[in-house]
C-alpha cells in the first residue's frame, strides 16, 4: 500500500519497514528454498518477476507488506510508529508480514433470487452483506530465527499499526484471518496466543483457518 511507503514500526529488536527495491535480491534468494515455497504456498519467480512484484505491491491498495528486520543490539519495546523509513542493513532481514484485503459475503447470500423483478432488493441486500477480511501472512525465513517469540511480537506490532493508523477503520475491516497448515503447531499456538480462534479445517489443503474479530 502507498500508505506505509514512509513508515517504520519500531519494536526495538524487531523493526518493520516497507518492502523496497533494495530488499528484493535477498527475498528472492529466500524464496528459492523449497521448504519456504511449501510453507508459503508460493511458486518460484525469476528475479525480474520479483522486482515487478515488489513494484506492484508498493501501490496495491489491497495488500499491505512489511519486511521484518532483527536488531539484536536493542532491547524489545512496545511498538512505535515512525513517519520515515529507518536506516537499516539488508543483512538484518529475517522475514516479512503481509495482509491481503478480500471481500466476503455472509453465509447463504448466494441463495437469493436474482430474477429481474427482485434485482434492486437483491443488490441492496448483497451490498449490506459484504464485509472485508484482512488475511494475514507471516514468514520468518531462516530456521535459526524461529521459535524465539519473534512471530508473536511481529504480528502484534503489525496489527497495532493497522489499527492505530486508521487502515482497519478506513478499509472497514470486520475481522482478521490466517490460514495455517494443520501440522504447524507453533504457528497455531502463536495466533491463538494473540486471540485468534480456529473456525475451520480445510481437508483438501490440510490447513486450519483462525479468525480474530475487530472490537472497534
Curated annotation (Swiss-Prot):
InterPro entries: Acyl_CoA_acyltransferase, GNAT_dom, NAT9-like. GO terms for cellular component: cytosol; nucleus. It is found in: Cytoplasm; Nucleus. Its EC number is 2.3.1.-. Disulfide bonds: none annotated. Its main location: cytoplasm. SUPFAM superfamilies: Acyl-CoA N-acyltransferases (Nat). Residues 68-215 form the N-acetyltransferase domain. It comes from the Eukaryota. GO terms for molecular function: N-acetyltransferase activity. Keywords: Acyltransferase, Cytoplasm, Nucleus, Transferase. Belongs to the acetyltransferase family. GNAT subfamily. This is N-acetyltransferase 9-like protein. It comes from Schizosaccharomyces pombe (strain 972 / ATCC 24843).
Amino acid at each position: 500500500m502507498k500508505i506505509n511507503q514512509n513508515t517504520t514500526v519500531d519494536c526495538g529488536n524487531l523493526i518493520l519497514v516497507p518492502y523496497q527495491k533494495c530488499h528484493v535480491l535477498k527475498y528472492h534468494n529466500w524464496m528459492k528454498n523449497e521448504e519456504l515455497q511449501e510453507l508459503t504456498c508460493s511458486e518460484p519467480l525469476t528475479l525480474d518477476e520479483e522486482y515487478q512484484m515488489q513494484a506492484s505491491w508498493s501501490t496495491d491498495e489491497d495488500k499491505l507488506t512489511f519486511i521484518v528486520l532483527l536488531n539484536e543490539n536493542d532491547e524489545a519495546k512496545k511498538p512505535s510508529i515512525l513517519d520515515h523509513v529507518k536506516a537499516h542493513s539488508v543483512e538484518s532481514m529475517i522475514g516479512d508480514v503481509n495482509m491481503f484485503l478480500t471481500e466476503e459475503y455472509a453465509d447463504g447470500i448466494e441463495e437469493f433470487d436474482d430474477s429481474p423483478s427482485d434485482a434492486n432488493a437483491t443488490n441492496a441486500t448483497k451490498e449490506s452483506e459484504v464485509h472485508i477480511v484482512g488475511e494475514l501472512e507471516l514468514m520468518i525465513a531462516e530456521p535459526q530465527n524461529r521459535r524465539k517469540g519473534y512471530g508473536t511480537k511481529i504480528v502484534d506490532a503489525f496489527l497495532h499499526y493497522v489499527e492505530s493508523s486508521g487502515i482497519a477503520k478506513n478499509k472497514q475491516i470486520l475481522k482478521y484471518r490466517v490460514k495455517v497448515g494443520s501440522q504447524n503447531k507453533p504457528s497455531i499456538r502463536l495466533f491463538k496466543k494473540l486471540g485468534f480462534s480456529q473456525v475451520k479445517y480445510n481437508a483438501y489443503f490440510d490447513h486450519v483457518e483462525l479468525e480474530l474479530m475487530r472490537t472497534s
